[in-house]
Amino acid sequence: MANEIELGSLDLRYESFRLKQPALEERLLSSILQRGIEEPLEGVEVEPARVLLNGFKRYRCARKLRLATVPYSSLGQDEAAAILGLLKLSNHRTLSILEQAAFIAELKTVRRMNGAEIASELSRSKSWVTMRLGLMAELSAGVRQQLLPEPSPFTRICI
């Protein structure tokens, strides 16, 4: 169930994991202007913040429209479990392979999960996980910067 939350209360630490699509974002902005935000932003409750995982385009549109509140749905309090949940749904939601790779690298490096654990949790093969980890490892910093957006100045508001 979605609740209304203050836009400024969101921690955007994963914004740089998601690709920007300006044309799609412009269409979304127009839609939100006409009908409001129809699908809640999704995140995880990590004290003292709400960490946004899904809905960065909606977030940026809300900020452009100077909305004070947005609909928000919590994916729980366990950050690793929430990321795994987002990845499980990535076939139904449009996470690109690069976005998947960034989240999997986060699970491996920061959350200290190994490839077999990640594969098992996602019901995927170890090679599926390894391919995405390899993709992140092979990207130079310059290419990664061009493909993935720069973090917003508000990225770590509550950390």
For the regions a language model picked out, list residue spans one by one.
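Short, charged/polar connector segments at secondary-structure boundaries
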Residues: 1-75
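Amphipathic, charge-rich alpha-helical segments that serve as recognition/docking helices
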Residues: 17-19, 60-138, 144, 155
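Short, proline-centered helix/strand-breaking motifs
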Residues: 38-40, 137-140
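Short, basic, alpha-helical segments at the C-terminal edge of helix-turn-helix-like DNA-binding modules
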Residues: 147-152
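A short helix-loop-helix "switch/interaction" segment in the helical subdomain of ASCE P-loop NTPases
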Residues: 158-159
